[in-house]
Swiss-Prot record:
Region spans: Fusion peptide: 364-384
Organism: Mouse intracisternal a-particle MIAE
GO BP: any one term: fusion of virus membrane with host plasma membrane
Site (Cleavage): 362-363
Oligomer status and interactors: The mature envelope protein (Env) consists of a trimer of SU-TM heterodimers attached by noncovalent interactions or by a labile interchain disulfide bond.
PTM text: Specific enzymatic cleavages in vivo yield mature proteins. Envelope glycoproteins are synthesized as an inactive precursor that is N-glycosylated and processed likely by host cell furin or by a furin-like protease in the Golgi to yield the mature SU and TM proteins. The cleavage site between SU and TM requires the minimal sequence [KR]-X-[KR]-R.
Protein name (record): Envelope glycoprotein
UniProt keyword list: Cleavage on pair of basic residues, Coiled coil, Disulfide bond, Fusion of virus membrane with host cell membrane, Fusion of virus membrane with host membrane, Glycoprotein, Host cell membrane, Host membrane, Host-virus interaction, Membrane, Signal, Transmembrane, Transmembrane helix, Viral attachment to host cell, Viral envelope protein, Viral penetration into host cytoplasm, Virion, Virus entry into host cell
Taxon lineage: Viruses, Riboviria, Pararnavirae, Artverviricota, Revtraviricetes
Length: 584
């Protein structure tokens, strides 16, 4: 039974191969295949096209939220490069983005003076200390550490408007705005971040010590935008309470110190100037809104992104030192690297196919025939002009020669333009046909062959689009032999025009019956040759048409015989009689 099945399958394979030999097909071409890979997280680099979106696990923070996901061992030994990768660390050495707990505030317009003290012991300098109170929306959470040495002005892709919002009485007044004050977050300068809470450390509004270390005018509740070098950005606001923290609205007490130098002329400050101005927030004055405390809140990412977690360097990762999870809990792991799992990978494979994806492109035969016909007609007109030279009187011949020269000159210019126009038209037709073919192919995209972990599509690997090849072929065609012959024909035509234009007949030689008979015979001989050439061309076309019809009839007959043979195999009968018809 098994032998019979093998024999039947062998005959079926032979008939299938015979059938393939009768019709055009694509054999052994490379196709795009979709390979299902084993999940292996790859670090997200600074030049990645897409950055992940971060989520918090606390709904009350008013930020994007996801449920907490447990951790699992990494399952292998790997060495992950930290520099240039999107990774974070909590107050430790390494090349990841450093995060630290710090207090930041959005200082409102409500402000008042408490007291002022002055030191006038020096005649030229007066030191003034002003104690003030300031209303502020403050947050004690996780942020980038301050950097007093970075004064570089950067630019980020604008994913949100720049704006300043009114105080609406919220405890966490998150805005949908993006700050224009930007800084680098790593020493290799691969990631930029906004808002930079210290724009210029030397400005008088910067608080370098006290409860808040920041620029007095900055707004920490804007979008925390982290961007890579290729314009990919993400928001880090969900990391605010990853170590826990608190938030509230209160009034703080601060001290503003500055010195007045008397006797120094300044156009903007009359007879004195200010230097060494500093602002420092020293402590609470009174609480306006109750403080809200938050525990350590893990941050999560959505698949296909995940975290690779560790408490040591990522350069040496093992199954015991690194873990993977959708969420990062700093109470368990102080370092996290964002990774992405490429679940499906496109790969080129070589496989036989019975699909005829696209019909063959039309060549430029029609264009060449039209151009050659134009050249032939121009040459025939030139020959007719030569023949008519002796058939008319000498007086009219000079005028005819000049008119013929002008006409052929115009036709030469028109033929050159027509050549370029027809080439452009052919290219447009080929490009339109290619686009229709690609749309048809994409509309019917599926698995031509589906294996356990591999889907072989019908999309050709090298010839997915023929547009570039068509343009290249067009350029080669224009520079080929046909184009050279066409240019030679035009040059010969121009030479003939010049020769006709330089022809001047003597009136004494234009009379006589013998000369007229000779010219008439020459004229008749030229047109007889043109007629015979046309008859021969028509006969050749008829013979070619007959051969094509005969070939199509033979192919139709062979397909019917093969179909009958396949039907005989399915019914258990012998297909030998049908195969013998193919041999005959």
């Amino acid at each position: 039974m098994v032998q019979k099945m093998l024999t039947s399958r062998g005959l079926f394979l032979i008939l299938t191969m015979l059938n393939l030999s009768q019709v055009p097909s694509i054999m052994g071409e490379q196709r795009w295949a979709i390979l299902s890979t084993f999940p292996k997280p790859m670090p997200v680099r600074h030049d990645a096209i897409v950055f992940p979106k971060f989520f918090t696990t606390n709904k009350t923070v008013d930020l994007p939220y996801l449920l907490y996901d447990p951790t699992a061992p990494l399952g292998e030994n790997r060495s992950l490069l930290e520099q240039g990768s999107l990774c974070f660390q909590i107050n430790g050495p390494g090349n990841c983005i450093n995060l630290t707990a710090r207090a930041l505030g959005k200082f409102n317009e409500h402000r008042g003076w408490v007291s002022t003290t002055q030191d006038t012991s020096n005649v030229e300098i007066t030191f003034t200390n002003r104690t003030f109170w300031q209303e502020v929306n403050w947050v004690n959470g996780t942020f980038l550490p301050p950097n007093f040495s970075d004064k570089e002005h950067l630019h980020q892709p604008k994913i949100a408007p720049h704006c300043s919002l009114e105080d609406e009485g919220l405890i966490l007044p998150w805005s949908d705005c993006q700050s224009s004050i930007i800084r680098w977050v790593d020493q290799s300068k691969t990631f930029s971040f906004s808002p930079n809470m210290i724009d210029d450390p030397e400005k008088e509004f910067v608080m370098k010590k006290g409860l808040f270390i920041q620029d007095f005018r900055m707004h920490p509740f804007h979008k925390w935008v982290l961007c890579g070098v290729n314009g990919s950005c993400t928001e880090l606001n969900p990391l605010i309470f990853i170590q826990g923290g608190a938030v509230g609205k209160a009034s703080f007490t601060g001290i503003s110190r500055f010195a007045q130098y008397w006797g120094i002329h300044d156009a903007s400050q009359d007879s004195y100037g200010y230097t060494n101005t500093s602002v420092e927030i020293t402590g609470f004055n009174k609480t306006l809104v109750n403080q809200i405390n938050y525990p350590s809140t893990p941050v999560c990412v959505y698949p296909p992104f995940l975290f690779i977690l560790s408490n040591d360097s990522f350069e040496v990762c093992s199954n015991d030192s690194c873990w993977i999870s959708q969420c990062w809990d700093v109470t368990k792991n102080t370092r996290a690297m964002v990774a992405r799992i490429p679940r499906w990978i496109p790969v080129p494979v070589e496989t036989p196919s019975t699909l005829s994806m696209f019909r063959q492109k039309r060549d430029f035969g029609i264009t060449a025939a039209m151009i050659i016909a134009i050249s032939a007609s121009a040459a025939a007109a030139t020959a007719a002009g030569y023949a008519m030279v002796s058939a008319v009187s000498g007086t009219k011949l000079n005028q005819l020669s000049a008119d013929l020269a002008d006409a052929i000159t115009v036709q030469t210019s028109a033929s050159t333009k027509l050549k370029g126009g027809l080439m452009i038209l052919n290219q447009c037709l080929d490009l339109a046909e290619e686009q229709i073919g690609v749309l048809h192919q994409m509309a019917q995209l599926g698995c031509e062959r589906k294996l356990e972990a591999l889907c072989i599509t019908s999309v050709q690997y090298e010839n997915f689009t023929y547009a570039a090849n068509l343009s290249r072929q067009l350029s080669l065609y224009l520079a080929g032999n046909w184009s050279e012959r066409f240019d030679e024909t035009l040059e010969a035509l121009i030479a003939a025009v010049l020769k006709i234009n330089s022809t001047r007949m003597d009136l004494s030689l234009t009379e006589g019956l013998s000369s007229w008979i000779s010219s008439a015979f020459s004229y008749f001989k030229e047109w007889v040759g043109v007629g015979l050439f046309g008859v021969a061309t028509c006969c050749g076309l008829v013979v070619m048409l007959w051969l094509v019809c005969k070939l199509r009839t033979q192919q139709t007959r062979d397909k019917v015989v093969i179909t009958q043979a396949l039907a005989a195999i399915e019914q258990g009968a012998s297909p030998e009689i049908w195969l013998s018809m193919l041999k005959n």
